[in-house]
Swiss-Prot record:
Miscellaneous comment text of the record: Is not active against sodium channels (Nav).
Family note: Belongs to the sea anemone sodium channel inhibitory toxin family. Type I subfamily.
Protein name per Swiss-Prot or TrEMBL: Delta-actitoxin-Axm1g
Disulphide bond pairs: 4-44, 6-34, 27-45
Compartments where found: Secreted; Nematocyst
A Pfam family matched in the record: Toxin_4
Length: 47
């Protein structure tokens, strides 16, 4: 999957660990949306 920046990772993509994965059809079971204002396409989810 494509990594994405969770709210808990910090304010900027540069220099922070991207702990989320972008899911196009919503977060799968057992995952949660980790970005309040998430990517333009899909959802930024993490386990």
């Amino acid at each position: 999957g494509v990594s994405c920046l969770c709210d808990s990772d910090g304010p900027s993509v540069s220099g922070n660990t991207l702990s989320g994965i972008i899911w196009l059809a919503g977060c799968p079971s057992g995952w949660h949306n980790c970005k309040a204002h998430g990517p333009n396409i899909g959802w930024c989810c993490k386990k």
